[in-house]
From Swiss-Prot:
Function: Catalyzes the conversion of 3-deoxy-D-arabino-heptulosonate 7-phosphate (DAHP) to dehydroquinate (DHQ).
One Gene Ontology term, aspect cellular component: cytoplasm
Name of the protein in its database record: 3-dehydroquinate synthase
Entry annotated with the keyword Plastid: no
Residues involved in Zn(2+) binding: 164, 228, 242
Cystine bridges: none
Cellular location(s): Cytoplasm
Record field: catalytic activity: 7-phospho-2-dehydro-3-deoxy-D-arabino-heptonate = 3-dehydroquinate + phosphate
Pathway terms, separated by semicolons: Metabolic intermediate biosynthesis; chorismate biosynthesis; chorismate from D-erythrose 4-phosphate and phosphoenolpyruvate: step 2/7
InterPro entries: Dehydroquinate_synthase (IPR050071), DHQ_synth_AroB (IPR016037), DHQ_synth_fam (IPR030963), DHQS/DOIS_N (IPR030960), DHQS_C (IPR056179)
Gene: aroB
Record has NAD as a keyword: yes
Needed co-factor(s): Co(2+); Zn(2+); NAD(+)
């Protein structure tokens, strides 16, 4: 097992990565919120909810509050959330607001949740069609990434999550990117050491960003949105998995950076080659109508400021800058998602 700690406004969070983790050490008397269909790793009172984005509703939130109240939870209690990213989002919001904050331990069970959603302190619920409209920043006491959960993960879901891993290398750590390129076959085979390295290094990289910009006030945390400006629009229009859309978005945004003179030409092709080896899409067979729909979504990106979108731009592998990019240039980047043949 490997572990590290990161600091934040509430103190320190322990992050553990390995197999057969001792959950009881982190929550001796847990109240367990667990995704339906998963075996509970802990004994104690539990509430089961469906996974997926639909769980991030006020109805689900009320059920969690009622569960905590029925169990007599107070500020010394610990909620242990076991599941994918959406359930962890809900749990974070619930723990951060119930009695103005109770203990929280997160147990992500998907690769995407491990390398992305679990770390950062964000909790939210959706309001109608608007995702994450109501939210909090609330850091957990511990994040327990037990790699045993990943052995039964469907192949497409596993590969999709690797887009976020590639993002860390592309934007923040060229050495990690090179390691991924050299070890991609072992990662795809889910070799224990390779998967542990993927999860551990991804979390270390993200933690280094969260530590210096916990509340998204300095612009540094924007780097975690590389590939997401275009990717979010692609995800909504084409119905891809999140990581698949981010993969397409990474390549499109790198091409945009090349066109604008920020990035050496050929970098986008190099990254696209790695993503293709992973089995992820790097372009889409899109109609003109679909591209226009995606462009219209970019106009409503939350990072937009007037005629510009404040977005992270990669200038070389492992390095980035925060730039105001004209909306027209971002719309042109959407054109890059279309396969040339």
């Amino acid at each position: 097992m490997r572990r590290f700690y990161y600091r934040h406004s509430r103190g320190v969070t322990e992050v553990a990565v390995g197999k057969r983790l001792d959950y009881a050490t982190y929550a001796p008397s847990p109240l367990v919120l667990i995704e339906e269909g998963l075996p509970s790793p802990l004994e104690g009172p539990s509430l089961r909810l469906r996974g997926g984005e639909e769980v991030k509703s006020f109805d689900s939130l009320l059920r969690v509050y009622q569960f905590l109240a029925e169990q007599g939870a107070d500020r010394s209690s610990t909620l242990v959330a076991v599941g994918g990213g959406a359930l962890l989002d809900l749990a974070t919001f619930a723990a951060g607001t119930y009695m103005r904050g109770i203990g929280l331990v997160l147990v992500p069970t998907t690769l995407l949740a491990m390398v992305d959603a679990a770390l950062g302190g964000k909790g939210a619920v959706d309001v109608g069609p608007v995702k994450n409209l109501v939210g909090v920043f609330y850091q957990p006491r511990a994040i327990l990434c037990d790699l045993e959960w990943l052995q039964s993960l469907p192949d497409r879901v596993y590969r999709s999550a690797l887009a976020e891993v590639v993002k860390y290398g592309v934007a923040l750590d060229a050495d990690f990117y090179q390691w991924l390129a050299e070890n991609v076959d072992e990662v795809l085979r889910r070799g224990e050491r390779a998967v542990e390295e993927v999860v551990y290094r991804s979390l270390k990289i993200k933690a280094s960003i969260v530590e210096v910009d916990e509340f998204e006030e300095r612009g540094i945390r924007q780097v975690l949105n590389v590939g997401h400006t275009v990717g979010h629009a692609v995800e909504r229009v084409f119905g891809l998995l999140h990581g698949e859309a981010v993969s397409v978005g990474i390549v499109a945004e790198l091409k945009m950076a090349e066109e604008l003179g920020y990035l050496t030409r050929g970098t986008s092709e190099e990254v696209a080659t790695l993503l293709t080896r992973i089995g992820l899409p790097t372009c889409i067979r899109a109609s003109a109508e679909e591209l226009e729909k995606a462009k219209s979504l970019v106009k409503f990106d939350k990072k937009r400021r007037g005629e510009y979108v404040l977005m992270p731009v990669v200038v070389r592998l492992g390095k980035w800058v925060l730039e105001k990019v004209h909306v027209g240039e971002v719309e042109r980047a959407v054109d890059f998602v279309k396969c040339s043949a």
